[in-house]
UniProtKB/Swiss-Prot annotation:
Homotrimer. GO terms for biological process: diaminopimelate biosynthetic process; lysine biosynthetic process via diaminopimelate. GO terms for cellular component: cytoplasm. Substrate binds at residues 104, 141. It comes from Neisseria meningitidis serogroup C / serotype 2a (strain ATCC 700532 / DSM 15464 / FAM18). The lineage of its organism: Bacteria, Pseudomonadati, Pseudomonadota, Betaproteobacteria, Neisseriales. Pfam families: Hexapep_2, THDPS_N_2. NCBIfam families: dapD, PRK11830.1. Its main location: cytoplasm. The keyword Transferase applies. SUPFAM superfamilies: Trimeric LpxA-like enzymes. The keyword tRNA-binding does not apply. This is 2,3,4,5-tetrahydropyridine-2,6-dicarboxylate N-succinyltransferase. Keywords: Acyltransferase, Amino-acid biosynthesis, Cytoplasm, Diaminopimelate biosynthesis, Lysine biosynthesis, Repeat, Transferase.
Length: 273
């Protein structure tokens, strides 16, 4: 049986799987899948085009199964002690392994094993959960969190305190995805499998989930579940039909192309809106 088939079959019987009952075949399949996620050979989601992604459900199932096949134990990353089922990504790394990986991890940065961090990424004191993929040149700033199985594109900037939602708790169908060259402003939250498409700028303190209305003030269109390519987004509100109250929404105040984005600072894009 293929790795995928073993995982799929085991997941159907997951309620019966424990650290003592798991078969050697299933355990090795789960651990091998986690190793492939950790190395970047496998991803929970693969990009087909702008805003188009294929989710590898079986890889996500392997992540869930990994919690059933291992007991909690005392873990040590050299600085802190943990009591968990998942070791940190670089707990046992040598200097050569860090050099080969090619990213920076400052004191206080935590990534769990099973997450992938590409070259030229900077991890400030932040948290990258299992199954996540952080692509080349991304900045994960102080107190930012990258949730389980989330996909972070090339040259993305996650500002201080940003939260990118995971899929494991509560269980979600698709991971949250931030495509290439996006900027997510401080303390913003993108969750529940929302896709922020390439080259978008999310201002500080914007909260977007699947039910959040995303209003394009230029066209009058309302989006949900995705931020279109090149959008500049701020917090806003929409009036109720009877005008008695307003409810939170996100507002697309303008669109920018890659050329404009390259020539313009984020601060300039958010001025005069």
């Amino acid at each position: 049986m293929s790795l995928q088939n073993i995982i799929e079959t085991a997941f159907e019987n997951r309620a019966d799987i424990t650290p003592t009952t798991v078969t050697p075949e299933v355990k090795e399949a789960v651990l091998e899948t986690i190793r492939q996620l950790d190395s970047g050979k496998l991803r929970v989601a693969e990009r087909l085009g702008v805003g188009e992604w294929k989710v590898n459900e079986w890889a996500k199932k392997a992540v869930l199964l990994s919690f059933r096949i291992q007991d909690n134990e005392v873990l040590n990353d050299g600085v802190n002690k943990y009591f968990d089922k998942v070791p940190t990504k670089f707990a046992d790394w040598s200097e050569d392994e860090f050099k080969n990986a090619g990213f920076r991890a400052v004191p206080g940065a935590v990534a769990r094993r099973g997450s992938f961090v590409a070259k030229n990424v900077v991890l400030m004191p932040s948290y990258v959960n299992i199954g996540a993929y952080v692509d080349e040149g991304a900045m994960v700033d102080t107190w930012a969190t990258v949730g389980s199985c989330a996909q972070i594109g090339k040259n993305v900037h996650l500002s201080g305190g940003v939260g990118i939602g995971g899929v494991l708790e509560p269980l979600q169908a698709a991971p949250t995805i931030i495509e290439d060259n996006c900027f997510i402003g401080a303390r913003s939250e993108i969750v529940e499998g929302v896709i922020v498409e390439e080259g978008s700028v999310i201002s500080m303190g914007v909260f977007i989930g699947q039910s959040t209305k995303i209003f394009d003030r230029t066209t009058g269109e309302i989006y949900q579940g995705r931020v279109p390519t090149g959008s500049v987004v701020v917090s806003g509100s929409m009036p109720s039909k009877d005008g008695s109250h307003s409810l939170y929404c996100a507002v697309i105040v303008k669109r920018v192309d890659a050329q404009t984005r390259a020539k313009t600072s984020v601060n300039e894009l958010l001025r005069g809106i």
